[in-house]
């Protein structure tokens, strides 16, 4: 004869609609367990419905758990807490609170703590505080939960205050406070607390090692690491990461070589460290030796090659990743490889990657679609970029995506199309941002739409909610400078609100040099010198402007002032990549092994330029680059 519990179970589980149909689902496995009870001839061990409710809540099947819960004739506090916790895990605090309030006097400290934790997880700190204060009793877990909530919200002092009030503490309490202080960079306080700990475990030691290393105190971190009574792989990784992040890659490598075991984080940290140190060969060698690679490993290598402008190598690694097939690209992978395609103007490769993205879960990701727009833009495929935008392939038409499309047109000199895109954006109810205006000014500048650009700048000035950045002023200079209307900029030179830097004034002076605007240049130089800025570039530019306009005495005077102040112009430099080798050239430097041949070629070019009257001033003659 079957037990009473089995009879109760049968009434609940005959309604198979309670459960979903997926065989891979743990809830179905639970259902199959119950079915086996009915088919068993021997007397089975019957799981209680309360147990099944708890299991369903653990796997997120709250709807099924709730149906079973509502059908129970009697419920104990454990079952109530299971269902409340199930709702909390899904972020449904409204339903969790409704059940919590129904429990009344039956709820225990576990139920209360679960609710406090739920409100903290949902960023409702004030409600969590009130609930914590209302608790009829608290245990150490309750205190730890609230302390961690304060710490995660950045209220470290409040967390410390609560920590001091605790009637009893366990090692989790101490570790939580140490980690919280470390994360906020309050290392001395963390160390003081660490030294006061009655007992330390590997988590305590690792938190301090990690905190010291991340705050630049690598040697102190190493001394602590060496004193650890026991270490786990997280401890080793913390120390290696500390060395790598502080540009001490050789020491990181030495430690890496003697690790008793390594995980993905160990290998990936070292690869990242070598890449940051511009040692791509070592990074590649380590990557090839990895026993197993995850998506971070592949993405790190791809990103490293992109950052080092070795875009073809990045594409090769991406191809190997696809052939390997053990992991799928993530958002970071796609963004990096699309950046490589953009730099190479590799439209075919970019289109192939677009096809992969369209079949992945990332096809609507905002960052990925923005990278696709950028790739099509740099490849000159404006129609493809616009098609993506118009056909809804961009995840959502928010301000970022509108700005991206305006930038696409702006950077290709399609000023009118950029403005039309802006007008459509306004019709859709979007308010322009500072970035929007920057793109519009750039578009107008490169399309020669001076009046329209000036209108946009005035709109920006009138909108007090938006910051006026240096880049806006620099774009304005470029806009007016290209049209030979630098006088329109002078009104902004004396504007008190315009926090302008040397690069802004340098842009005006460069434009004055092109358009021979001596009077405006003098006004700008006066303003620069009034700010107390003594920059060699200012004197050199003004000297060149004087020289270009035949004012040799004034030019010589500027050079003399520069000399009296002990200012020297930073030597110009440039570099070119031939094959896989970078060649650096600095003004006045003759150390390059092919200097004589290069100097001869440049001299021939210089003579041809003179014959074609391409050299326009004595100033330019003096500034001629000598390798």
Swiss-Prot record:
The molecule here is called Pentatricopeptide repeat-containing protein At2g35030, mitochondrial
Source organism superkingdom: Eukaryota
Pfam families found in the cross-reference section:
E_motif, PPR, PPR_2
Region: Type E(+) motif, residue numbers: 580-610
Which SUPFAM superfamilies is this protein grouped with?
A: TPR-like
Q: What terms describe the molecular function in GO for this protein? A: RNA binding
Upper classification of the organism: Eukaryota, Viridiplantae, Streptophyta, Embryophyta, Tracheophyta
What are the PPR repeat spans here? 45-75, 76-110, 111-138, 139-173, 174-200, 201-235, 236-262, 263-293, 294-328, 330-360, 365-396, 398-432, 433-467, 469-499
One of the protein's GO biological processes: RNA modification
Question: Which residue ranges does the record annotate as region Type E motif?
Answer: 504-579
Its keywords, alphabetically, are:
Mitochondrion, Repeat, Transit peptide
Annotated compartments: Mitochondrion
Q: State the GO CC annotations.
A: mitochondrion
- Transit peptide as recorded in UniProt: 1-44
Q: Which family does it belong to?
A: Belongs to the PPR family. PCMP-E subfamily.
Annotated InterPro entries: E_motif, Pentatricopeptide_rpt, PPR_At4g14850-like_plant, TPR-like_helical_dom_sf
Q: What is its main location?
A: mitochondrion
């Amino acid at each position: 004869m079957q037990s009473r519990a089995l009879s109760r179970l049968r009434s609940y589980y005959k309604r198979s609609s309670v459960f979903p149909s997926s065989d891979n689902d743990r809830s179905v496995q639970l259902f199959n367990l119950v079915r086996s009870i009915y088919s068993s001839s021997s007397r089975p061990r019957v799981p209680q419905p309360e147990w099944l409710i708890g299991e369903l809540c653990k796997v997120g099947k709250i709807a099924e758990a709730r149906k079973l819960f509502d059908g129970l004739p009697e419920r104990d506090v454990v079952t109530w807490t299971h269902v409340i916790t199930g709702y909390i895990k899904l972020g449904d605090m409204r339903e969790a609170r409704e059940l919590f309030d129904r429990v009344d006097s039956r709820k225990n400290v576990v139920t209360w703590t679960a609710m406090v934790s739920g409100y903290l997880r949902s960023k409702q700190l004030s409600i969590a505080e009130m609930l914590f204060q209302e608790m009829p009793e608290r245990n150490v877990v309750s205190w730890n939960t609230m302390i961690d909530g304060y710490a995660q919200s950045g209220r470290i002092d409040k967390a410390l205050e609560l920590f001091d009030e605790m009637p009893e503490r366990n090692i989790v309490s101490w570790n939580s406070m140490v980690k919280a202080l470390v994360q906020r960079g309050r290392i001395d306080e963390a160390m003081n607390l660490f030294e006061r700990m009655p007992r330390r475990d590997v988590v305590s030691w690792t938190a301090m090692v990690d905190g010291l290393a991340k705050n630049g105190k690598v040697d102190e971190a190493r001394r602590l690491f060496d004193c650890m009574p026991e270490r786990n792989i997280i401890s080793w990784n913390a120390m290696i990461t500390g060395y790598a992040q502080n540009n001490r890659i050789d020491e990181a490598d030495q430690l890496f070589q003697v690790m008793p075991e390594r995980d993905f984080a160990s290998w990936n940290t070292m690869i990242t460290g070598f890449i940051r140190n511009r040692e791509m060969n070592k990074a590649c060698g380590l990557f090839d030796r990895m026993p197993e690679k995850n998506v971070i490993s592949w993405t790190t290598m791809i990103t490293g090659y992109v950052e080092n402008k070795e875009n073809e190598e990045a594409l090769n690694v991406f191809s190997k990743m696809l052939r390997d097939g053990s992991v799928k690209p993530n958002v970071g992978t796609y963004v990096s490889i699309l950046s490589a395609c953009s730099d190479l103007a590799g439209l075919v490769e970019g289109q192939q990657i677009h096809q992969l993205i369209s079949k992945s879960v990332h096809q609507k990701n905002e960052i990925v679609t923005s990278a696709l727009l950028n790739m099509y833009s740099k490849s000159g495929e404006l129609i493809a970029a616009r098609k993506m935008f118009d056909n809804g392939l961009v995840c959502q038409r928010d301000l970022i995506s509108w700005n991206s499309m305006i930038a696409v047109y702006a950077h290709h000199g399609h000023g009118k199309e950029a403005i039309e895109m802006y007008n459509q954006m306004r019709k859709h109810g979007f308010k322009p941002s500072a970035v929007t205006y920057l793109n519009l000014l750039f578009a107008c500048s490169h399309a020669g739409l001076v009046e329209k650009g000036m209108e946009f700048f005035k709109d920006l000035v009138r909108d007090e909610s938006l910051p006026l950045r240096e880049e806006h002023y620099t774009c304005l200079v470029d806009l007016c400078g290209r049209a030979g209307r630098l006088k329109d900029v002078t009104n902004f030179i004396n504007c008190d609100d315009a926090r302008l830097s040397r690069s802004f004034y340098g842009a005006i002076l460069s434009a004055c040099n092109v358009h021979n605007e001596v009077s405006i240049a003098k006004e700008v130089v006066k303003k620069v010198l009034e700010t107390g800025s003594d920059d060699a570039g200012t004197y050199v530019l003004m000297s060149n402007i004087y020289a270009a306009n035949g004012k040799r005495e004034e030019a010589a005077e500027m050079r003399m002032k520069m000399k009296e102040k002990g200012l020297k112009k930073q030597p110009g430099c440039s570099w070119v990549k031939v094959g896989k080798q970078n060649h650096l050239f600095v003004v006045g430097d003759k150390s390059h092994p092919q200097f004589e041949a290069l100097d001869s070629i440049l001299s021939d070019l210089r003579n041809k330029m003179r014959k074609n009257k391409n050299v326009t001033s004595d100033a330019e003659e003096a500034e001629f680059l000598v390798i």
